[in-house]
Regions:
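Membrane-embedded alpha-helical bundles of multi-pass transporters/translocases
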Residues: 2-454
Length: 454
């Protein structure tokens, strides 16, 4: 048998603490996702072409460091476990890197700006990887109980949706307040605040969680063998495909969102109104995952259903705007976020279950390695989405802080509505084929506990 769960039930404080970990993640990565691209182009003064190239280049960097970090977490030995120590050490370092990334020097020559951008962004991505991979893997190490895992991921998603809502509501006003005389000062100050939140949340997560799934010591296993095992794990491959599509739709749209409100709607403050309208639906949507899972008993089918309706509601938004049809526009925004939040909970709840399936199928348990490729898949989707957006905007004549031409405005509009909408429907089709239901999962766990493998 590959693992043993000493205590299937997880204390409420541990579930809350785990949720706070994602609060921290979103106060860094969602800030980066939503604001970094427009910071680079409109504040730092870096060209769209350079930003697009960075997004693609950084994924080659991820392809190297994500599996390495995942493997290192699996090999970590400490009195705190395998994954928790990474939160304690890597979180404050990543917070500092976040601040450095948002330190703009618009007076520098273009080549100097690009070099600084590449170095700080790649270091930030590495730091975030050193926090996010062990954080994501930690859920599977806390319990093997499928219902408890669903509760933990619901806590994570609800906390994340609250954090995203708060961040989206307060960020533009904070940038205006602290950047009244200089936009670069505003971004730097906000980065300092969010960096502190990031570190504090992960300290709390470290302090109040516990790794209860015991993995016996095993001989060193090559990357080739681990990759071969992963390729035999069909539920995991579907989850990985879902994460790639998720990254493309989420981060591509997020990179566009401030451009959309600034240039298409003509008023960046609409973004704050939009954020206020989606925060409650976000929380409700995340909380709806568990009752729907109890009914369907298949996390993949739940994710598929949420993805389908996210796509349909997002496509509907193309026909309305905040300026002329505010009630319908914001209502559809709330509906879209409701379904998205349910999906977000479901897709992350799937991943720990795939670890047990892989262990049962191949005899190999490699939590961190598997989560590393989930993280990489999400980042690949992010890279393609953001690089494609930046490349198209640059190609068709985007000029920072100026009135944009019709083609550029059309790209911004479609990137906010139709393009992600279509890919959400594709995501729904992919995850519909996820077959690992609750009954089969529990049978697999029992076989592992009894030392049997089919």
């Amino acid at each position: 048998m590959g693992s043993e769960n000493k205590n299937g039930k997880v204390p409420l404080i541990s579930k809350i603490a785990y949720g706070f970990g994602d609060v921290g993640c979103n106060f860094s990565w969602m800030f980066v996702s939503n604001f970094l691209m427009i910071f680079y182009t409109d504040v730092f003064g870096i060209s769209m072409a350079a930003v697009s190239a960075l997004m693609l280049f950084s994924r080659f960097w991820d392809a190297i460091n994500d599996p390495i970090v995942g493997g290192l977490t699996d090999k970590t030995k400490s009195r705190w476990g395998r994954y928790r120590p990474w939160l304690l050490v890597a979180a404050p370092i990543t917070a500092i890197l976040l601040v450095m990334t948002f330190w703009a020097r618009p007076d520098w020559p273009q080549n100097g700006k690009i070099i600084y951008m590449v170095i700080t962004y790649c270091l930030l991505v590495l730091g975030y990887t050193c926090v996010n991979i062990p954080y994501g893997t930690l859920c599977g190490a806390m319990t093997q109980d499928i219902d408890e895992r669903a509760k933990i991921n619901t806590s994570r998603s609800v906390a994340a949706m609250i954090a995203i809502g708060v961040l989206n509501i307060i960020t533009v006003p904070l940038l205006s307040k602290f950047g009244s005389h200089s936009a670069k000062t505003g971004y730097l100050t906000v980065a300092v605040i969010y960096g502190c939140v990031f570190a504090a949340c992960h300290f709390f997560c470290f302090a109040k969680t516990k790794e209860a799934v015991i993995t016996p010591e095993k001989e060193k296993i090559s990357v080739k063998v681990q990759l071969k095992a992963v390729m035999q794990n069909r539920p995991y491959l579907l989850a990985l495909a879902g994460q790639i599509l998720f990254g493309f739709t989420l981060y591509g749209r997020n990179a566009d969102i401030l451009y959309y409100f600034t240039y298409v709607e003509g008023n960046a403050s609409y973004y704050t109104t939009y954020s206020m309208c989606i925060i409650i639906p976000s929380i409700i949507g995340a909380a709806c995952f568990q009752p729907l899972f109890r009914k369907l008993n298949n996390k993949g089918r739940v994710a598929s259903l949420f993805a389908l309706f996210t796509g349909i509601s997002m496509l509907s938004m193309f026909f309305f705007n905040a300026k002329e049809s505010p009630a319908i526009f914001y209502a559809l925004s709330g509906l879209t976020q409701f379904f998205f939040s349910g999906f977000n909970t479901a897709i992350y709840a799937i991943i720990p279950d795939c670890v047990e399936y892989g262990e049962w199928k191949t005899g190999l348990r490699n939590d961190g390695f598997q989560y590393a490729f989930i993280s990489l898949g999400n980042k690949i989707g992010m890279a393609v989405g953001t690089a494609l957006l930046a490349g198209l905007l640059g190609k068709y004549g985007y000029i920072a802080n100026q009135t944009q031409n019709v083609i550029v405005l059309s790209i911004m509009k479609h990137a906010f509505t139709t393009i992600p909408g279509v890919f959400w429907i594709v995501t729904a089709v992919v995850l519909f084929f996820y077959r690992l239901n609750k009954k089969r999962y529990n049978e697999i766990v029992e076989e592992l506990k009894n030392g049997r493998k089919s």
